[in-house]
C-alpha cells in the first residue's frame, strides 16, 4: 500500500484518495499538497479518516493507552496542514473556503488559534527541549471532570489549557519565565493554588489550574480568569477556540491529544515527538 505514496507522476490528491480507500494513512514525512484545491481535499479526507480511527479506537473492547498508528499518522498529517495554513493567509483563505461544514468552522478556529499562539511564542533553544509521554487520554479526562465538579471550571477549558501549555505534558521544558509542569505554573503561584500537590503531576496540576481559574473569576468571567492565567488576549482567544472545538465534537479532544509537539527554535520549526523524526 505504501507504494501508492511513492508514485512520482500522480497528484498527491489522487494518492491520498487511493491510500484512504486501502486503509493506509499518510507517512510521517508525506509532502503536503501545494494548491488550495488539493490541500482542501487532503484535509477533508484526512480529517474523515482521523475521526473514523478515533471512533474505532474508543469503541474497541480494550482501547490501547496510546493512539493507534493510523490515528497518529492521520493526526500528524492534519496538524501539518493546519500549521502550513496558519503561516500563509492567502492559501488559508482559498483552502478554508472549499471546506464543507462542520469541518470549515473547525478549521477556521484551529488556524486562527495557531496564528494567535505563533504571535506570542518566542523561539527556544533546542538544547532546552524536554519531552515525555502524555498520561492516557481517559485518565486526563477524569482529572478534568473532577476539577470541573470541584471548581466549576469547564473540563473543556481545562483540556484546552493543558493542550496549549504543554501538549498534555508531552512538552516537559520549563518556560523562559520559569513556569513548570503540565499546566505551566510559576512556583510562587503553585504554592498559593496548588493545594499542596506536585507541580509536575498531571492530576495535581489540573486541579491547581482549576483552583486558580475559579479564584480569578471562572466560570462567571472566563476571559478574565484566562487572562490572569496568561495575560495575553491572543492566548485567551486560542484557548477558547480549542475549548469550543472540544465542546462541538468529543472526538476533537482525542484529535488534539493525538497531535505532536512542534517547537519554534532560532533555526525554525522543529517537531520533537512522534514517528519519522
Task: Describe the residue ranges of each PLM region.
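Residue-level detector of alpha-helix boundaries and kinks
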Residues: 39, 63, 129, 174-175, ...
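Cell-wall glycan-active module
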Residues: 1-149, 233, 237, 241-277
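Alpha-helical segment that forms one wall of the substrate-binding/catalytic cleft
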Residues: 134-150, 156, 169, 182, ...
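Short glycine-rich loop/turn motifs that provide flexible caps or phosphate-binding loops at active sites
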Residues: 159, 177-180
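Glycine- and aromatic-rich loop/turn segments at beta-sheet edges
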Residues: 170-178
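Surface-exposed patches in mature extracellular/periplasmic domains of secreted proteins
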Residues: 90-94, 152-160, 173, 218-229, ...
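Solvent-exposed coil/turn segments that connect beta secondary-structure elements
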Residues: 164-167
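Surface-exposed, polar/charged faces of alpha-helical domains
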Residues: 66-69, 177, 220
